[in-house]
Amino acid sequence: MAQNDTLIKGWQPVIGLEVHVQLMTNTKLFSPAKNQFGEDANTLVDLIDLGLPGVLPVLNEGAMKQGIKFGLATNAKIAETMIFDRKNYFYPDLPKGYQITQLHYPIVRDGVVEVNGKKIRIHQAHLEEDAGKSIHDKYDDKLSLIHISEPTRP
């Protein structure tokens, strides 16, 4: 397709991708629990991961630094203030009933990655914790289990 061609007169296709990356930090994004892959289900869990009353999340400084490094590497604008949002939804694999994310105020905006001479725009990059993981059909076809070690991974 030539640069000025369009599929339908007056329209040009634009494709966007949402890419999820798990950061290699020692601990989870808002929890002191270890952030290790491949461990048995529900062995790396802290009270913060479960959302028990009275527990308060603390941001993982290493994850924040990795986000800033990504912004610098992509020549992006780095947020001067870190603001997180509480995205409420109810899934069995989200024990708190909400996910902490940077929905409205991401750590990085307007970056660029060059690939084969073409500039690919990075609209934003934000930090957010993972939800849990539902496990279906592993032990019984009538039973679903929840892997709680996943929540709050950066």
Region annotations inferred by a language model:
Residues 2-145, 149:
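Basic, nucleic-acid-interacting segments
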Residues 150-154:
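Short "domain-exit" segments at the C-terminal end of structured domains
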